[in-house]
Amino acid sequence: IQHKENVCKLQLDEHGVMIKIEVNMVGRGLIGGATKAPLCEAAQEQFDAFCAMPLVPLSQLYGGKICAALDRQHPRDLFDVKLLLDNEGFTEEIKRGLLFGLVSSNRPAFELLDPHLLDQRTAFENQFEGMSAIEFSYDQFEATRLQLIETVKTSLNESDKAFLLSLNGLKPDWSTYDFQEFPSVKWKLLNLQKFRQDNPEIYQQQIDALKGVLKQ
């Protein structure tokens, strides 16, 4: 048993079987109130156990999940995204959570909105296969990834695009999304200011790239 306190992870290894128990830490602040939710009925029945824990708002939960799916493109993230798209759908509230994730991320927004597609066959075979009772093939992974990218792009209206450009241009307009007091957003702005000061040409290239993606 290994307890990694700094990342809130418990790793169990017995007879060649490894189980990782992780708690997602929230350092960005909450865009809504947390709610306590019980373990789903299927898991309660499977493991004959019960627990309940506080969860971030659904919009932030899936907004962050979508940012992660666009960033690292891991099969587990895209599996969760497929379930979202097949059930709740990509709602306005989830879009709000996505935009919060975009302006809190260390990655440039244009890279998340128009990601370079990664070959994830090895990750799929070694880090996903056998984990889910619901069928999810590699072909479905690729189709879900393309669907997500298209869904995100088409969901952004002119106000959303103007907000992203204003923040990345270091003249944020908070009239649409009032994220100005969140520590992650303040940190993003500080990093952008330093980036513009230290590398003005590359900074402008990234602004132009964002404009290009938002015109697609």
Q: Can you describe what each PLM-predicted range is?
A:
Residues 1-2, 83, 162-167:
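Short glycine-rich, low-complexity/disordered patches
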Residues 3-135, 200-216:
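Catalytic cores of NTP-dependent nucleotidyl/adenyl transfer enzymes across multiple folds
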Residues 129-216:
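Long, low-complexity C-terminal extensions of enzymes
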